[in-house]
Swiss-Prot record:
Keyword Plastid: no
Function noted in UniProt: NDH-1 shuttles electrons from NADH, via FMN and iron-sulfur (Fe-S) centers, to quinones in the respiratory chain. Couples the redox reaction to proton translocation (for every two electrons transferred, four hydrogen ions are translocated across the cytoplasmic membrane), and thus conserves the redox energy in a proton gradient.
Subcellular location: Cell inner membrane
Protein name: NADH-quinone oxidoreductase subunit B
Species the sequence originates in: Pelobacter propionicus (strain DSM 2379 / NBRC 103807 / OttBd1)
Record-listed [4Fe-4S] cluster binding positions: 32-33, 98, 127
Cofactor remark from the record: Binds 1 [4Fe-4S] cluster.
Keywords: 4Fe-4S, Cell inner membrane, Cell membrane, Iron, Iron-sulfur, Membrane, Metal-binding, NAD, Quinone, Translocase, Transport, Ubiquinone
Gene3D superfamilies assigned to the protein according to its UniProt record, in alphabetical order: 3.40.50.12280
Length: 163
């Protein structure tokens, strides 16, 4: 008679493991960091092995908003609307010096960091950042996703208050 084997794990660990290898990015590319973003998407760096290869072209199908480049005050409502259209759970990556702090375009028309309008989960510094830094950021985001608590029901609270 064959011995039956069972794998036991916690619900959060299983869902975290599945989600961390199925990241669907939505690139919001506005400036010169877009050239380096295209290099990251090439076969030389192969982001598919991290589960983040296929960019989505609608925010409703994505869970990672990659803000690449300069964000002006006129673009701020657009990026806020894109963020609001994304389904939960969602994460935001600020790609480059312009997205994180305004960069070299520090004047009255440029938003001094995308974190002033939407919450940012991970920052990638540099002008432009190297593809290796982007891969490292994806790996750190995967660790963050794997460590999160994943409620099955939408009304289940993250930190329940004892009665």
């Amino acid at each position: 008679m064959a011995m039956m084997e069972y794998l036991t794990t916690r619900k959060d660990e299983l869902i975290g493991w599945v989600r961390k290898f199925s990241i669907f990015p939505y690139p919001f590319v506005t400036a010169c960091c877009g050239m380096e973003f295209m290099a990251v998407a090439s076969t030389l760096y192969d982001t598919d092995r991290f589960g983040a290869a296929l960019p989505r072209f609608t925010p409703r199908q994505s869970d990672l908003l990659m803000v690449v480049g300069t964000i002006t005050h006129k673009e701020a409502p657009v990026i806020k609307r894109v963020y609001d259209q994304m389904c939960d759970p969602k994460w935001v990556m600020a790609f480059g010096a312009c997205a994180t702090s305004g960069g070299v375009y520090r004047n009255y028309t440029v938003l001094q960091g995308v974190d002033r309008i939407i919450p940012v989960d991970i920052y990638i510094p540099g002008c432009p950042p190297r593809p290796e830094m982007v891969i490292d950021a994806i790996m750190k985001l995967q660790d963050k996703i794997a460590g999160e608590r994943h409620p099955i029901f939408p009304y289940e609270k993250q930190n329940p208050v004892p009665v």
